[in-house]
């Protein structure tokens, strides 16, 4: 098993420890479609310098993901956060693209990529700018019942370099 992260984000130690422990303690070939994701608290992941995109997560009573909704243009406000005029709970769990995956998942990812590529073929704009987004694909697999994803809550504070102002001087 392995972890996948964004290259321009700092996630914090707790998130790495939780992903590692889950993969070490839970992975077997029989459980190859049981994945995990670090669930950050939205308020710990907002930039002071502009908007961000986050996967807003819904979980069941056992902390398994039931839904991930990519939410664009989330900005900090004086009393919380909003996206395109809609308030968002700053205590909501969000995906920061820190996933614990299995070798068997790579085959599913490949199948999905072939389908994605076939769907954009012939559309020049999509061929040049289309993105195969991991959270969206994992959400599709969740909805089909192909995989399960355990949300591992972390209190870590994220910071990234989305904006040049995010980088410390």
Language-model-detected regions and their locations in the chain:
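Alpha-helix termini
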Residues: 1, 24-30, 116-120
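Short beta-strand-to-loop acidic/aromatic patch adjacent to the donor-nucleotide binding site
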Residues: 2-10
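Structural beta-sheet core signal
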Residues: 4, 37-38, 151
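Cofactor-binding loop segments of dinucleotide-utilizing enzymes, especially the Rossmann-like FAD-
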Residues: 7, 40, 154
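Short, active-site-adjacent cap segments at secondary-structure transitions
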Residues: 10-12, 158
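Conserved core of the sugar-phosphate nucleotidyltransferase
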Residues: 12-99, 103
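Conserved alpha/beta core of the MobA/IspD/sugar-nucleotide pyrophosphorylase nucleotidyltransferase superfamily
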Residues: 59-61, 68-169
């Amino acid at each position: 098993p392995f972890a996948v992260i964004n290259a321009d984000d700092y996630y914090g130690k707790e998130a790495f420890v939780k992903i590692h422990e889950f993969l070490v303690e839970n992975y077997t070939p029989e459980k190859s479609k049981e994945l995990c994701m670090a669930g950050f608290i939205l308020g710990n992941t907002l930039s002071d310098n502009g908007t961000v995109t986050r996967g807003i997560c819904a979980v069941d009573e056992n902390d398994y993901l039931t839904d991930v909704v990519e939410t664009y243009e989330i900005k900090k406000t004086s009393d919380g956060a909003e996206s395109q005029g809609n308030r968002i709970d700053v205590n909501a769990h969000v995906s920061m693209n820190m996933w614990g995956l299995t070798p068997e998942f790579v085959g599913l990812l490949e199948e999905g990529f072939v389908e994605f590529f076939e769907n954009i073929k012939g559309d020049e704009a999509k061929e040049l700018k289309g993105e195969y987004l991991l959270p969206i694909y994992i959400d599709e697999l969740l909805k089909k019942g192909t995989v399960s994803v355990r949300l591992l809550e972390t209190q870590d504070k994220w910071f990234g370099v989305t904006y040049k102002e995010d980088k410390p001087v």
